[in-house]
């Protein structure tokens, strides 16, 4: 069998037992990492909303926040979630798609009553809304324990943010809402940092901005010479290969052979 060298997009000629078969080489199309886009959409919109909650900017900025919620916080995260689906990343796909739709739903809760399509949501309804999103975020946070520390910070501070928003709605305390706003700024800033870190580290090919990667410790597996079985219950049908050709073991398997 002979092979001809080829470049991307070329055909590969394979001579097999006197026959020549043309094999089309498909160009692999890779997807860029969508996480920074989703994290920036989430982080920047969260910071702007919570600057308002903290009382740093007044209610005249609400239009800007709604626009960010529709496009960058909402649409950008949904796009990132779809890209994560294509990459087979269930965590990223679920997180980005869900929080993108969260921003759209929040904009809907604010705009639909003003447009006459629904009644304003009461404090109990908003508290239940934030409770469910907090519960979802806590479940997602559990999964981040297998990921990096920076991502854990994003989800933990977001979990705290949702429950502080819930309590703020139930209590009606303006001081607590302002405190919640500052916590939300921290949450959004942590997402922005992680996004910039992922971009920078990928461009430079090394960890320039630390994100606290968790390294899994692999268990050491002892090696066994040919003809010997690893410790454990005997395997039915297994017989160690006898030495051949002047004492050399048969090279078929590092643990011997099946007969």
Regions inferred by a protein language model and the residue ranges of each:
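Membrane-helix exit/interface motif
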Residues: 52, 79-83, 105-119, 136-143
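Alpha-helical membrane segments in multi-pass integral membrane proteins
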Residues: 128-139, 149-197
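Juxtamembrane/interface segments of multi-pass membrane proteins
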Residues: 60, 112-125, 170-179, 205-210
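Short, highly charged, low-complexity non-transmembrane loops/tails of multi-pass membrane proteins
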Residues: 204-228
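Membrane-helix interface "capping/anchor" motifs
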Residues: 83-91, 142-153
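N-terminal topogenic module of multi-pass integral membrane proteins
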Residues: 2-80, 84, 239-257
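Structural signature of hydrophobic alpha-helical transmembrane segments
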Residues: 59-72, 120-132, 154-155, 182-185
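Hydrophobic/aromatic-rich structural module bridging two neighboring secondary-structure elements via a short loop
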Residues: 78-103
């Amino acid at each position: 069998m002979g092979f001809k060298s080829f470049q991307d997009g070329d055909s590969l000629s394979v001579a097999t037992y006197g026959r020549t078969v043309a094999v089309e080489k498909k160009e692999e199309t890779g997807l860029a990492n969508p996480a920074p886009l989703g994290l920036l959409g989430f982080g920047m919109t969260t910071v702007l909303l919570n600057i308002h909650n903290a009382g740093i900017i007044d209610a005249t900025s609400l239009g800007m926040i709604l626009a960010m919620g529709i496009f960058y916080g909402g649409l950008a995260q949904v796009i990132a979630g779809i890209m994560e689906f294509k990459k087979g990343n269930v965590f990223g796909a679920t997180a980005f798609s869900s929080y993108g739709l969260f921003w759209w739903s929040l904009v809907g809760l604010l705009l639909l009553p003003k447009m006459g399509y629904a009644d304003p949501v009461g404090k109990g309804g908003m508290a239940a809304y934030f409770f469910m999103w907090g519960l979802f975020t806590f479940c997602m946070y559990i999964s981040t324990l297998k990921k990096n520390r920076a991502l854990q910070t994003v989800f933990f501070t977001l979990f705290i943010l949702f429950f502080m928003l819930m309590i703020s709605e139930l209590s009606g305390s303006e001081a607590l809402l302002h405190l919640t706003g500052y916590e939300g700024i921290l949450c959004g800033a942590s997402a922005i940092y992680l996004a910039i870190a992922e971009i920078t580290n990928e461009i430079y090919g090394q960890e320039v901005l630390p994100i606290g990667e968790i390294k899994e410790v692999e268990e050491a597996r002892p090696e066994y010479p040919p003809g010997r079985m690893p410790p454990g219950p005997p395997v039915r049908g297994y017989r160690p290969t006898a030495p051949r050709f002047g004492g050399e073991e048969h090279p078929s398997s590092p643990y011997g052979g099946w007969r």
